[in-house]
Amino acid sequence: MYSHGSESLIRQAREIQDSELQKFYIRLVKLLQFKEVSHELLDSLHRLYLILSANKYSRTLPSELQQSLVSLLSSPSEQLQVLSSAVLRETLPPFGEDKNIGQLNSHAAGLLLSQAGSKDDLPDLCAQLIRSLEIRPSDGPVPSLMHTLPLVNSILTHCPECLTADHLTLLNKKLVDWLRYASIVQVGGASSGGFFSGSRSRQPAPIAELDGTVSGDFFTVLCVGQGFTEDQWMNVYSFSMLRHWLLTHHCVSNDSMVVDTANRLQLSLSFSHSLSNDDRSEVDGSVVSMVSATSSSSRLLSPKERLREKSFQYCQRLIEQCDRKALKKTDTELQKACLVEAVCILDCLCAEDPSLVYRTFPGIKALFGRLSSDLSFARVLLPVAQFYLNHGEMAAVDCESVWKLVFSQFPAELFNDPFLAHDFLRFLRLNLEGLQRAAPQFTRFFPNFLKFLAWNSPAVLEDFVDLLPSLVTPGSAVELLHTLLDLPCLSATLVLQLRSTTLPISDPGSRSLLSLNAFRNPTFRGLFLFLLRTEAGSGDTIERLSVLHDLLAEAAEWPRVVQCAQTAPVLLHIYFNTVVTVADEKLLAHLILVMLERSNLLLNMPTYCKEIHRVFSCQLLRLCKLHPSLVVDQSSELLEFAGTTANVYSKEDVYTHVVWVLGEYLSPSSDSRCSVRLITSCFESLEAVLFEITSSAPPPGSVCPAPKVITTLMSALAKLASRSHDLIPRVSLFLSKLRNITKGGSVPWCSDEEDMVAIVTRGEELLSLLKTPGVAQSVLTPPPHVNTPRWHRDTNLALPLQLLALTTLTHSP
């Protein structure tokens, strides 16, 4: 874990004596008295940090040293700030000492929060910080607001209950001040008039928009300049925490001035006529509040409602600013980020005050119309879709175009964007109930959604684990099963789709991917287009699936395809867990046929095929156990599968479970429609397969069948014979011959001696049972009350009652 040298230093730090430590403290205090930063001072601070951090318990430093280290937090040397902050984090704060918030910087702010012993210490610290926001220059040194506000936000994130009604009112007013009334001039502007330029040319320049024009409105995060004032930085900080504030802290207050929705609608509409008559902040001591007049309507609003109104205006201005063409590419990305945040904040505001919906929707609708043709704004349009989902019904707007864009175009064209994939799937997961109510058609787009999984399986698997159950419906169950089984093919097709647009069409004599040539070939275009479909409903699967698998044979080793194949079994289990809750017996019978058919129609990936067969085996057993009548309903297909000897070698796991299901549930006790003729037909099919595999060697390239297959066939024959006694001589004769054959030595169909012993033992057990048909039927086909006993529930059959009766009889005189 540590090198030998590091372990030695840690050991020395832990074993240092108190006397030596006190001398070290005194020497360090003397070093801190010098103004210059020496190497000895830096080494001593490093050593002090090692001593403090290597011990289990925190130490208390001498007060003089503690004060010197605290003073270093405001040192011009960044290195000293970092070292002093690290040392102080490892110490206990002096008892009873007030927190120093006069000269906050990033290191000092982090230290204040880290030295809070528990949540109980946070309310006092929060109150002290909030009080510092009210300090005026005339009252003394003003702490740095740029570090105070983020620290307050961090405390409230950990402990929202720190906030009192008075604190909330103050912060609401301050946020209004910072958001709406930051200065509109920039600092640091250089004069362009030379030495003889007049005072007018040296006046502070106004802030500018991203397109370079002079800003004619209030300052926002999208305004630019050569430098920014503190209140402009506070504007940026306030906007960055605004959504969290609205979601978390607005519910704390008990606002007595809240009016009903109709009154708030009337008040809010009064603000939409003009922004020139805006009220100014009412924070006590604010210069702005002393020189500005408030409108009559704004006086009716509480601080909470005023913040809501100013937030609305701020977001509206941001959306307008994003119409401008930015001069820098980085500013274009900033516009997108601000659009996302602005729309999310408007969504929060409308959820809090529904009357704002009618003022907000025209702008949101115009924003969607402007951005919907440019898919580079896809991540911006997702919050717009969220707004439509949350408020579209109230505003009575048609959302069909929004859902068509989001569900159809985004996954089809941007499946390889990992950030959009995360945002898109998160949008679906968080809004499942709302989408099922407002846009139930979203389940039709599951072939499109699965493109995210096919492209980036490990990153989004967890999302689909949550999302898949909502996509399983009676109408889509069969097609969804086929689509899940074709996930590796879809992954390969998406790779080919991207390569076909980037790689040139090769010359006839050059070497290229056969699958890429097939993708470009019009003959096979329909196969790939089916996989790339955006909506369900065009068919459950395709007829030439084996041809598609041959075309994609080389893709079986592509890393992306291999990763995708590993996720399919997980999702299939989730699929079947859901489908049994929504499907009727007719649909479940169809799914059994699909499993039998698709067990032989999978992309040639040995590990993948083995895992899918294991899933099919498990789920087939489960479906038949839930609905035994399915075995009779699908008896012809099951018998056809079980009667094909090749399935023993290629689909061993599925075959074994099909045979077991036939032997277990093909019985009159499970379904009254089960006739002797059906039992005999099944017996003859299984008998022929068992005779064939035990009388000859496996086909070339195949291994000997597992003993589990043979013993399952033998048990199934014995079960069927116990239900039709005319068949007992036939199975008894076969079991006797099998025992005699194995006595002659090794056999070609079983290469392991232990396996052979297990097979013979099972045969002898079955043969002994069949000698007494009544016992065989009771053991091999027990009645329902034996399979599902209720003795622990039936007091008349309870064992304690019987023991009590026997005890009474034996002890009676």
Residue ranges of predicted features:
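Extended, charge-rich alpha-helical scaffold/interaction domains
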Residues: M1-P813
